[in-house]
């Protein structure tokens, strides 16, 4: 961004103001976003400036937290801390983040978001008035003319809004999303689409719409090498249907950057790979496929009414299954992985909240998913139903859960039922359903996996038996775990003694089932444990040493067994006894580590060698200010998606890192 002789650039979570002195740049000031919804340096998703020299910064810190801050010079002093009213978002507020620079005219600020009914918003800085001018979700920055504001949507439609009458004209131009700002010259509008075509709109026009379109979704650089085979795909959030979160692909230093690309969304799932593509699902409803080898965008789809759905895609046999949750409606959607075209969708209920990233699991031709039911709002009606802040009780006094709720749930609302759905993979028709409400209330804090042709399901009901009794809820059980025939839904065994305790799914290997979690399993104790059950009988094999917590999943490799703790130690277990062999003082937040033996991979490509008692052998580049996501190894490459900073990157390793240069050097 250039304003006069001042160059404004984002760098490392700051905003740098460089003065062009004619012979050299001189740092004039460094702008920092003040503490709000966190302290870490945020990512900049867009910068703009007005005629008075004010700089507008759309930033994101974590988990939907961000806003458009205004920086300005008063004399030689840079003033920060002001922001455009109505642009602030976080997990407790109603509204999604924006990922684009704003357009400014006087005191009016125009801003797009990938959010239904709030696609283009007009903010008045003086009156604080907010007007929704278009409901179509968008990430392409709006462009102002004398009488209109123009933007392209994620649906491939160009929209022109009259600033006086607020009337809107729509032109469906593209098969792909329009993600870049339009250009305007000589009364004509030029719009580039992700379908690979440049479109022109205007009168007169002597150009015709293209009859033969580019096949932009086709692979141009397929994977090659000894690990390109599908059996080496990291095809679901936890690596495979057993939830093992581990593989062995001869990972070793040194690492080398292969490619990097921007991501206009927030995520909490790990990269998913299959068919030569890497797939990403943003919490705002975008599903994106890129070429694994180069990072080139292949296709992007956006579905309305998705709201903070931190869920993972699943790749299986040319199909992509993605749970997309929202407060208005939720669907598991099945897409053609090659084109992104929708094949079928099936409704479900509930909120994935922070930590239920898992997509469906598949047994034969049956796709199975677990969730809850009940009522949700941006903020819950009781403290246990919230993630901080003051509860908001509906006028009718009903119980409402925050859509992004606490990780510490002693009990759940009365109308929350634990649910399981099974659909035909080819048609989306229901094969069977289960509701476990007779055993307890809850459903969203759960886990599923498949081992040896059997489905395993575990759910948490809360640990506060006394409060559940007073509220008229079932008190006998704090949770349950069961083994199910995935074809019929028949229960093969069930126990109420051992169960996940939120923020963790199930994992299984060699006839054993592994259960972790974040919460206490029952009132009166602060200890947490990992349980190991016999997968054939449900009987306890061992209880681990006490741990701070066991988040996300217990990673179970051929040799090593590992779990992370929230702001605590990561632990390496003896898989035969549950004894902690040694601990790693990672002090990460809720990092979703993965294992590619003998290493575990953390945030910012941290590579920790478990065969050397947790030695850090490689790290970086540090592209993310948060610690929520680790990297994965798939098909002989490393893939990493930043939770906060809007990047997806890939690295090569070992001998390949010497021979395969970054993609941008060989184009």
Give residue spans per PLM region.
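Repeat-blade elements of multi-bladed beta-propeller folds
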Residues: 1-15, 40-69, 92-119, 134-158, ...
